[in-house]
Amino acid sequence: MHQLFAYLRFWLRSGNAHGLHSPFVFGLYTSVVRHTGTFAAYAAVEARRQQLLDSSASISVTDFGAGSHTGAGRQRRVAAIARTAAKPPQLAQLLFRLVNYFRPATVLELGTSLGLTTAYLAATDSRHRVITFEGCPNVAAVAHETFAALNLGNIEVIEGNIDHTLAPTLAALKAPLDFAFFDGNHRYEPTLHYFKLCLAHRTDESVFVFDDIHWSADMERAWENIKTHPEVMLTVDLFYIGLVFFRKNQPKQHFSLRV
């Protein structure tokens, strides 16, 4: 119910390309967000998605995040995870286009799940490095199968509670954090904690993407806090995700745009 009212509020205040006076945002919106073409990687990842949806296997799941609205228990079918936890094709492919557009060398993903979104993040360029975090070893094992099936060798999976693994992984980075997708814990405090940890490794050209910014009142509060952070110069609310930029040479701006 919260998401329904949140979407109605979003629809009333959001717009499209008409009236966009920022050349950067206009180009991003028309070339990436509203892009209607296809890429070769789409078919391969979606074929793997169908394999997971058809799977009869069950695994024991440990969830360190806010859980799901489905109320599913500890033992879960792989097909159910693919159906309810994996990002839908439209959103996962948007993330692919964002990475393809900005060409980051180092990509961080908080929340691997079965590896479908990770695969999209990695498939744009085999030369860039994707580091992804998954709390549950059994889920991570399925993700590894996904990467092997798609011949993706540029992905490193960090297993364990992100609260314990994120800081040391960031400390060991030998390059700036160019792109980060936050999908690991849909609660206020952890979201802001992960954001602040990653801030120390960003550049002015870094892109942070936050998933499910209207998922709950808690996540909306976190998003508002991120928007007003002094280092954040530009944010784009696409309802399902929020884009964060740190571009210094422009005034602070916020946009709400329909996908």
Pin down the residues of each PLM region.
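A short alpha-helical cap/connector motif
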Residues: 1-181, 185-207, 213-259
